């Protein structure tokens, strides 16, 4: 089945050719399952390992992909680190081409590791402790209970039915609120 034309060489791209070997099939499957926007930067990152005079073998690309996923989970941080690595290395390679220097493919993930560590503080999430969260929720629940009691009693007072709520705990809360309000 013909998918489309290659934007670079304009040859036809066939789905059968992409999944011809096991490594290609598995590579395509793994890339399609990447989350958090990691797929496109990962493909660009795999391209950095391509030898100058040949294509990157599907088995080698699958191994590289697996190594990256073993190092880091799919996340927005990984997507950003991959994108930044690809952009930076492409820029360096472009400058090297202009000066006539030889361009070597990547052989390890050290550059990605350094970019990942540099980007990590930008993606740090400050999480409050569980106890603090429970304390805040308990305080909010207590405040709501007081507010509901005040509104409940005030409604009876407005209707002239104060005697119906005089013996309730809500009435005491309302009296305390009224006294605090007058003190201000």
Curated annotation (Swiss-Prot):
What's the name of the protein? Uncharacterized protein HI_1489
């Amino acid at each position: 089945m013909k998918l489309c034309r290659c934007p670079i060489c304009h040859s036809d791209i066939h789905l059968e050719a992409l999944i011809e070997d096991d490594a290609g099939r598995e590579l395509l499957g793994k890339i399609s399952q990447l989350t958090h926007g990691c797929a496109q930067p990962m493909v660009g990152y795999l391209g950095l390992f391509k030898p100058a005079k040949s294509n990157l073998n599907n088995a080698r690309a699958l191994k590289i992909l697996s190594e990256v996923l073993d190092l880091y989970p799919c996340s927005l941080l990984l997507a950003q680190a991959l994108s930044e690595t690809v952009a930076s290395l492409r820029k360096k390679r472009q400058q090297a081409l202009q000066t006539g220097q030889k361009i070597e493919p990547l052989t390890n993930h050290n550059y990605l590791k350094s970019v990942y560590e540099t980007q990590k503080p930008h993606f740090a999430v400050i999480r409050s402790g569980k106890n603090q969260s429970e304390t805040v929720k308990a305080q909010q629940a207590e405040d709501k209970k007081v507010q509901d009691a005040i509104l409940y009693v005030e409604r009876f007072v407005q209707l002239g039915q104060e005697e119906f709520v005089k013996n309730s705990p809500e009435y005491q809360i309302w009296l305390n609120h009224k006294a605090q309000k007058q003190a201000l």
